[in-house]
């Protein structure tokens, strides 16, 4: 039946996306999009549009990805981690298009949903990166430090290493080479020579 094909298409696309397998063309996820539609709020409809957007994003069609992410947000019936992920991906699209204020807005929306949870570090890091892109180094440092504090509390070593690297870059751009060296050294200790 059509419902089974739509669910299969959605779950297979979701599994590929989660495992970083290229989504290829949109024919598979389009089956789910057509079945679930874009009128009635449901998690499956939101996910179908999200993954359709991810397929577009993978191909470099940012404006189409943005449209699908916005549709997914509209269709999402609950405020949960998945909604935060949609906002986070939408923010990345806006960041790519240099729409920095809108990117920060969406990272903040993701953060508001994730506040107090382990995943809150990701939108904070996004906010910091956008501030750095705008050459607002002090704001970037503030958000990178907030993200680092969360990653340290969660003992997420891969994220801690990445944030040490991020902080080293900001301090280097500020020409504070002593602080930059301190964070590079911490990153190397944690991640080995690959950190540089």
Language model region names:
Residues 1-196:
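A "functional boundary" signal
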């Amino acid at each position: 039946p059509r419902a089974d094909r739509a669910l299969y298409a959605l779950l297979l696309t979701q599994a590929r996306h989660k495992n970083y397998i290229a989504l290829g063309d949109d024919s598979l996820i389009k089956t789910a999009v057509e079945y679930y539609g874009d009128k009635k709020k449901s998690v499956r409809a939101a996910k179908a549009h999200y993954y359709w957007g991810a397929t577009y994003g993978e191909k470099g069609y940012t404006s189409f990805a943005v449209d699908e992410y916005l549709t997914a947000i509209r269709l999402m019936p609950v405020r949960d981690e998945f909604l935060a992920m949609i906002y986070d991906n939408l923010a990345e699209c806006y960041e790519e298009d240099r729409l920095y204020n809108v990117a920060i807005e969406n990272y903040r929306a993701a953060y508001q949903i994730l506040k107090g949870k382990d995943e809150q570090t990701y939108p904070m890091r996004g906010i910091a990166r956008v501030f750095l892109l705008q050459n607002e180094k002090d704001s970037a440092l503030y958000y990178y430090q907030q993200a680092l504090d969360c990653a340290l509390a969660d003992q997420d070593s891969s994220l801690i290493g990445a944030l040490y690297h991020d902080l080293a870059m900001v301090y280097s751009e500020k020409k504070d080479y002593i602080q930059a060296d301190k964070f590079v050294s911490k990153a190397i200790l944690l991640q080995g020579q690959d950190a540089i």
